Curated annotation (Swiss-Prot):
The protein's annotated pathway: Protein modification; lipoprotein biosynthesis (signal peptide cleavage)
Pfam family, one: Peptidase_A8
UniProt main location, coarse: membrane
Enzyme class: hydrolase
Protein name in the entry: Lipoprotein signal peptidase
Length: 201
C-alpha cells in the first residue's frame, strides 16, 4: 500500500509542475489577447502575411464543430472532457516511459486549459489563425498546440518502445538459436567421439 501511495504522490508532484506550467501559459496568453484584441479594428492583429491573431470564441468542439448546439454541447463536453482528463491521468500514472509521461502531461495540460475556458467563460477562446492565399486553417489556441504536441510525443514513444521490444525479442530469439545450434554441435561432437572411441576399442 505504501509503495503505491508513494508512486501516486511522486507522479502527482512531477506531473503537476508540467501541467500547471502549461495551464498558466495557456491562460495568460488567452487573457492577454482577450484584453488586447477586443479593441482592435476587425478584432484582429496581423503578425505576418500568413499569421493573424483574431478574437474568436468557440462555442462548439475543436475547429468550431457543433457550435449550433451550444446550449447542450457546453455542458456535455464539460462532463465528457473532465472524464477523459481523469482517464488520461490514470494512464499517466501507469506509464512506464518518460515519453509517455511527458505526452500525457502535455495532453492533460492542454485539455485542462480549455476546460477552464468552458467552465468560467462558457466557451473556448481561440486566437491563432494561419492562412495562405485562399486556404484558411481553423483558429486554435496554445492549449490545442499542447494537446497536439502531447499526441505526437505519445505516438513517437509508442513506436520507439515497440521497436525496442521487437529488437529485444529478436535478440532473445537469436540467442536461443545460437544456444540450440551449440547444443546440436556438442551432441554431434559427442556422438562422433563415441564412435571414434568404439573404433579404438
Amino acid at each position: 500500500m505504501l509503495p503505491l501511495l508513494k508512486k501516486l504522490y511522486l507522479t502527482f508532484a512531477r506531473s503537476s509542475r508540467i501541467i500547471i506550467t502549461l495551464v498558466i501559459i495557456d491562460q495568460l496568453s488567452k487573457w492577454w489577447f482577450i484584453d488586447n484584441l477586443r479593441w482592435k479594428p476587425d478584432l484582429m492583429l496581423k503578425f505576418t502575411s500568413f499569421l493573424n491573431m483574431v478574437y474568436t470564441w468557440n462555442y462548439g468542439i475543436s475547429f468550431g464543430l457543433m457550435r449550433e448546439y451550444y446550449q447542450y454541447s457546453n455542458a456535455i463536453f464539460l462532463i465528457t472532457n473532465t472524464i477523459i482528463v481523469c482517464y488520461l491521468y490514470y494512464l499517466m500514472i501507469r506509464s512506464k516511459t518518460i515519453g509517455s509521461f511527458a505526452g500525457y502531461s502535455f495532453v492533460i495540460g492542454g485539455a485542462v486549459g480549455n476546460l477552464i475556458d468552458r467552465f468560467f467563460r462558457g466557451a473556448v477562446f481561440d486566437f491563432i489563425h494561419f492562412h495562405y492565399q485562399n486556404y484558411s486553417f481553423p483558429v486554435f489556441n496554445l492549449a490545442d498546440c499542447f494537446i497536439t504536441i502531447g499526441v505526437i510525443i505519445l505516438i513517437e514513444d509508442y513506436y520507439s518502445t515497440k521497436k525496442v521490444i521487437e529488437e529485444k525479442a529478436k535478440g532473445n530469439y537469436d540467442n536461443a538459436q545460437i544456444e540450440a545450434m551449440a547444443e546440436k554441435i556438442r551432441n554431434t561432437d559427442k556422438g562422433g567421439n563415441d564412435k571414434i572411441a568404439s573404433l579404438q576399442n
